[in-house]
Amino acid sequence: MIPYLDLNKINQRYQAQFRKAFETFMERGQMILGDSVKKFENDYAKYCGTKYCIGVGNGLDALRLIFEGYKIHGKLKDGDKVLICAHSYVATVLAVKQAGLVPVLLEVDPKTFNFDLDALNAVNDPDIKALLPTHLYGDVSPMEAIWVLAQERGWLVIEDAAQAHGAVGIHGRRAGNLAHAAAFSFYPTKNLGALGDGGTVTTNDPELAQCIAYLRNYGSGQKYYNKYIGFNSRLDELQAAFLAIKLKDLDRDNARRIAIAQGYHDQVHNAKIVLPRPNFDG
């Protein structure tokens, strides 16, 4: 039997670095939104190729805060519809619903498990204002075609990149830098996983970035002044320190995962077993 993902084995190699990071955390005494969060935000923005990265509590909150930010800036409003993949995790639907928007599920291509472009092109609903492609199993959605259609229809494009840390899309750009904004999860099972919960938003939009930075912290940008009706969804200082350590090995780990996936595709020949279309370039 092939063993399931062993998180202990993955994290044991970092024990010494994690201990040192914990000692630094205790010495600094910065428990909330300190230097470790700032460092990871800068590191991950640079890795993704975006101008901004905002650490939040989890992937669900990352998606919801993007929607809430766009509502504040008048690009979305309650009742607007959002196109999402029918084959995705429940958090995708929850984020849309919690933001007061309406999820519209669209069928996926059975070969890729990402948006079916024929079904997408057939959509004709003026109430749809945003498109949320999910890069499932680390395979980036067909973003070039999605962008063309979104520009024609005037849709916002938001990446659900919870399973696509380091995945490469159009023009060699990484997931997180392929749309107006992107949401990531650092749940322990992700290929960049924390030792608890965590998430982040990446974007090149300065207004959205600042808005989300406020929203995650009770709507506040300075102590005792709450500009927005916000949330409590901050990336944990200690998790940020651990993630910064693991980020250095992400490309190497992804390459190993791709090699394993290649092995399955080369050796599994059974009509009853459907594997995602291989995309071994990223």
Residue ranges and their predicted role:
Residues 13-16, 76, 257:
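Pyridoxal 5′-phosphate
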Residues 1-30, 35:
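N-terminal "arm"/small-domain region of PLP-dependent enzymes with the aminotransferase-like
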Residues 111-194, 200-202, 207:
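Active-site phosphate-binding strand-loop segment of PLP-dependent enzymes
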Residues 30, 34-81, 87, 94-98, ...:
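Phosphate-binding glycine-rich loop
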Residues 2, 81, 155-156:
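Hydrophobic "anchor" residues on beta-strands that sit immediately upstream
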Residues 83, 104, 157-158, 183, ...:
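Structural detector of well-ordered beta-strand residues that form the stable sheet scaffold
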Residues 36-43, 47-53, 60, 118, ...:
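PLP-dependent aminotransferase class I/II
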